[in-house]
């Protein structure tokens, strides 16, 4: 009797920059030497969509080429559709999101569609990783790092039931330092709104730029990137402030 061949690795890719973005296409090209790659991504840029789901209209899905699907929806919609419908009978081994065109550091992760896509994969039981390039030039560098992470996971699975947020400096590969495990830093709140007039004279507003780093000390993702290191931050989705449970219980019982 012949031995059964090992099942080939299967990877789902998504993002928030859109199905035709350079980051996701570069990542897919790099990973196709390792695995079957299926792209399910938004039909346009959905940066900042966070974990939003489309509930008031249908999701329109178009197969734009073999194993590449465009979805009129958010990054979370894309992964939800892929795992609960498109690939439900043969789930992927990994969900990867990115490569994002820009950083997802500190509390950026609360707004990030890139991180949200990975979070949805995590919710649905698949090991998930978000990749972001801190810039818009060296996507090949970021894709090479992503491939190394996947290869290491294949050799020895990631030892934690957490989704990973990985940021890569926008540098040539040979200029990168090592990889550091970090915690999330924090930014000052963005307070500036940009007020303009549209062609009809109506007031319109744009959100201002992100605030500057507030907590960027040693051990944070901000600090690692500034020093030229790749940053890996394990994330959890339980938002419970466990250290506050007893204090809240005491407060409620006080007369």
From Swiss-Prot:
Xref: SUPFAM superfamilies: SurE-like
Residues binding a divalent metal cation, per UniProt: 16-17, 47, 100
Q: State where the protein is found.
A: Cytoplasm
> Which keywords label this protein?
Cytoplasm, Hydrolase, Metal-binding, Nucleotide-binding
Q: Cofactor comment in the record?
A: Binds 1 divalent metal cation per subunit.
Provide one Gene Ontology cellular component: cytoplasm
GO MF annotation terms: 3'-nucleotidase activity; 5'-nucleotidase activity; exopolyphosphatase activity; metal ion binding; nucleotide binding
Q: Is the Cytoplasm keyword given for this protein?
A: yes
Q: Does the keyword Nucleotide-binding apply?
A: yes
The catalytic activity of this protein is classed by the Enzyme Commission as 3.1.3.5
Pfam families in UniProt: SurE
Protein task: Nucleotidase that shows phosphatase activity on nucleoside 5'-monophosphates.
Q: What is this protein called?
A: 5'-nucleotidase SurE
Gene field: surE
């Amino acid at each position: 009797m012949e031995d059964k061949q090992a099942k080939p690795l299967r990877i789902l890719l998504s993002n928030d920059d859109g199905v035709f973005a350079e980051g996701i296409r570069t990542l897919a090209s790099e990973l196709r030497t390792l695995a079957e790659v299926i792209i399910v991504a938004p039909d346009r840029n959905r940066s900042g969509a966070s974990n939003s789901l489309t509930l008031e209209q249908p999701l329109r899905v178009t197969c734009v080429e073999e194993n590449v699907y465009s979805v009129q929806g958010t990054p979370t919609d894309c992964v939800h559709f892929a795992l609960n419908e498109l690939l439900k009978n043969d789930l992927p081994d990994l969900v990867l999101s990115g490569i994002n065109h820009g950083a997802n550091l500190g509390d950026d992760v609360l707004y990030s569609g890139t991180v949200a896509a990975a979070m949805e994969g995590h919710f649905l039981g698949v090991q998930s990783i978000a990749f972001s390039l801190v810039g818009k030039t060296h996507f090949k560098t970021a894709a090479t790092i992503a491939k190394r992470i996947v290869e290491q996971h294949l050799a020895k699975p990631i030892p934690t039931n957490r989704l990973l947020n990985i940021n890569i400096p926008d540098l040539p590969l040979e200029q990168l330092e090592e990889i550091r495990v970090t915690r999330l830093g924090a930014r000052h709140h963005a307070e500036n709104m940009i007020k303009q007039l549209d062609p009809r004279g109506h007031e319109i507003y744009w959100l201002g730029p992100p605030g500057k780093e507030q907590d960027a000390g040693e051990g944070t993702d901000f600090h690692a990137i500034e020093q030229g290191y790749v940053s890996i931050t394990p994330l959890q989705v339980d938002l419970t402030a466990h250290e506050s449970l007893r204090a809240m219980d005491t407060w409620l019982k006080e007369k």
